[in-house]
Amino acid sequence: MSERCRCKYSSGASIDYMPTSTQAKMVSKRIAQETFDAAVRENIEEFAMGPDEAVKEAVEQFESQGVDLSNIVKTAPKVSADGSQEPTHDILQTLSDLQESVASSRPQEVSAYLTRFCDQCKQDKACRFLAAQKGAYPIIFTAWKLATAGDQGLLLQSLNALSVLTDGQPDLLDTQGLQLLVATLTRNADEADLTCSGIRCVRHACLKHEQNRQDLVKAGVLPLLTGAITHHGHHADVVREACCALRVMTFDDDIRVPFGHAHNHAKMIVQENKGLKVLIEATKAFLDNPGILSELCGTLSRLAIRNEFCQEVVDLGGLSILVSLLADCNDHQMGDQSSVQELVKQVLSILRAIAGNDDVKDAIVRAGGTESIVAAMTQHLTSPQVCEQSCAALCFLALRKPDNSRIIVEGGGAVAALQAMKAHPQKAGVQKQACMLIRNLVAHSQAFSKPILDLGAEALIMQARSAHRDCEDVAKAALRDLGCHVELRELWTGQRGNLAP
């Protein structure tokens, strides 16, 4: 790029500074879409570049200045067919056409423009961002209200457009939209496609937005979500979306609020809406679909937050289903390798969650859970996620349970854990959970120390301790309980300040 072009960018671009979520001291530079478009237009008009070259030069120049262009539409604005309008981006032209057709109450045109709007927004998140900046939400909301008069096809397209627009932009949903969303789901509970799209809107509106979560829960969305799983129990897309939405309701991911209602929402799903029963029953319709089973198991693990909820999973027959699923995965009876590994990880996650109840620990062992967990870790040794979850589940089963520790060791659990440590030396999660498992196995059963040490445990634990800072405490605890020499340091001695006697 010429020196002249560089000077124009550096003098003409209005750059804002926005803090990122990950680096407190670093800042991310951002520009407006108009600034980028002006730079592209200058390249075309003053330097005789073609549209593609002009965009490429603008991108390179702004990025060289550290500008974040993730929310910028990186195409040259187009001139309208008749040349009567200023050049604009496709998404803004579609938005303008949609607004005109909505204002004129022409449903067929509205439908066509909504479809085009969805297609364009799906191609690039920058299109969604630009559309939102230019007033897309009130236009879609008006189309949505127009569709509620009874046009099911237009209603579905309106919900699809809303779900695409709110993906990553949950602040767009206002009080009116929230109320209309709940009303739409209530009135169309029998329609699978409408229910699926509406629930997707709920999920997008609630992700990283605590206020929307609380407002939707108060408006009665939880029974609509569990009811959708019950009513459309054989419709995979509805079940998947409903599970995702239920999980989002239990998240505490909004950094703008000091604390959320995740725990209360999980309790409400279980106690007021029979969430555990609904999810466990739903698994029976998808025993040959590892993708949906993963969603169901992942949601169950988010709800097993209390001692009695863990026991309820067992009482409802959930434990036998989980152990059977794990055995089927180990026997290669379902799906491709990646989907099977994801299902195994989710089954292990829920087993780990419900093993927080001491009575459930024993029930899992009696049901053959330890053998299935060890087999899963051995079968999927190349997956660090499966190894980590396997060690974590066995760790919970061994906690305060010497008899369970014996069964785990005799079943090859210690061997499998050490193999996992060898296979994934750089994975802190695997190393940490394996150290915790070994510690729990020998904490109340010193007889297992020598056999485990003979397998090379000390060297592996020392390696984990030196490689991963997070493993320091658990590694020392494991070495101590194995009978190895560990140098313990006093972090606070009370020798200085007011703590001294």
From Swiss-Prot:
Sequence positions bearing Pros-methylhistidine: 263
Mapped ARM repeat ranges: 220-264, 274-318, 319-369, 370-412
PTM text: Methylated at His-263 by METTL9.
Name the UniProt record assigns to this protein: Armadillo repeat-containing protein 6
Single biological process term from Gene Ontology: hematopoietic progenitor cell differentiation
Species for this entry: Pongo abelii
Keywords for this protein: Methylation, Phosphoprotein, Repeat
SUPFAM superfamilies: ARM repeat
PANTHER family tied to this protein: ARMADILLO REPEAT-CONTAINING PROTEIN 6 (PTHR22895:SF0)
UniProt entry tagged with the keyword Phosphoprotein: yes
UniProt record similarity statement: Belongs to the ARMC6 family.
Phylogenetic lineage: Eukaryota, Metazoa, Chordata, Craniata, Vertebrata
Source species, domain of life: Eukaryota
